[in-house]
């Protein structure tokens, strides 16, 4: 009798060992996995604007700014940040190493090309530009404005990052939608010292392009004691073009007659 029991157990164990477990095709499964390397609050802001995966899939951004002296068209390679700004009287470019200026006529460019070549791109590409390497995030007090409270995230840079590592930004967002609403920023390019005054831009007019929620209008505000006061001016953006194809690299090279900016 014991022999029969032992034989039955052996057959049972062998059957279990030979049993095949069906493979699961995880490509067809929806997995709840958190992979963000960013703080939760800024991750939610990115998500409210279409998500970093969608942004990172794009290689080219072009936008037009409507200005009093004529349209200004900016094209940027999103992967290497080479850029080209076409203005009525001038062209500014960045080839990855040097900033250059080309005059189209006798009009003198009165700005600073090295300061300006990526300035409006940074403002326009918010909040995604705040996912760059070398950034430090910190929660700060909410901005109280006209009866509304906007949670804040302070952005600073590690030493040696960019032309102005002393720059600081504060992104304020809607606590319900997590969409960006305000940007506070300092300007340190000229002084090379940490700024004490925050300037303010309001982001409250959006448009969806290729699945990404991008600004349609930026509104600058006057400021006092590091707070926005009254509206100063609007700057509309039109003809937004996002592409998964890289722009022609030759367009960023300095043409004949251009001046390299030191």
Region roles according to the model:
Residues 2-7:
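Sec-dependent signal peptide recognition
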Residues 17-19:
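Bacterial signal peptide processing site
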Residues 12-15:
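C-terminal motif of bacterial Sec signal peptides marking the signal peptidase cleavage site
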Residues 151-252:
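Gly/Pro-enriched, hydrophobic low-complexity segments
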Residues 101-167, 191-194, 251-261:
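Flexible, processing/modification-adjacent segments and terminal tails
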Residues 48, 136-141, 201-203:
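Short structured motifs
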């Amino acid at each position: 009798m014991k022999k029969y029991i032992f034989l039955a157990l052996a057959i049972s164990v062998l059957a279990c060992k030979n049993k095949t477990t069906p493979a699961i095709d995880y490509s067809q499964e929806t997995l709840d996995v958190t992979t963000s390397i960013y703080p939760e609050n800024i991750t939610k802001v990115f998500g409210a604007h279409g998500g970093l995966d969608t942004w990172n899939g794009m290689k080219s951004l072009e936008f037009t700014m409507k200005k009093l002296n004529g349209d200004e068209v900016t094209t940027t390679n999103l992967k290497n940040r080479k850029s080209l700004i076409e203005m009525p009287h001038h062209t500014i470019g960045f080839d990855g190493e040097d900033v250059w200026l080309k005059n189209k006529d006798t009009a003198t460019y009165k700005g600073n090309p090295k300061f300006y070549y990526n300035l409006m791109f940074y403002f326009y590409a918010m909040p995604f530009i705040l996912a760059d390497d070398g950034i430090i995030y910190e929660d700060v007090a909410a901005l109280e404005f006209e009866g509304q409270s906007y949670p804040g995230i302070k952005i600073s840079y590690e030493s040696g990052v960019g032309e102005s590592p002393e720059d600081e930004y504060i992104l304020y967002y809607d606590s319900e939608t997590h969409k960006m609403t305000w940007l506070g920023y300092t300007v340190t390019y000229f002084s090379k010292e940490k700024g004490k005054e925050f300037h303010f831009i309001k982001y409250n007019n959006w448009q969806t392009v290729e699945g990404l929620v991008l600004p349609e209008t930026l509104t600058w505000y006057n400021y006092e004691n590091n707070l926005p006061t009254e509206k100063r001016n609007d700057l509309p953006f039109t003809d937004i073009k996002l592409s998964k194809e890289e722009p022609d690299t030759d367009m960023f090279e300095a043409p004949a007659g251009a001046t390299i900016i030191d």
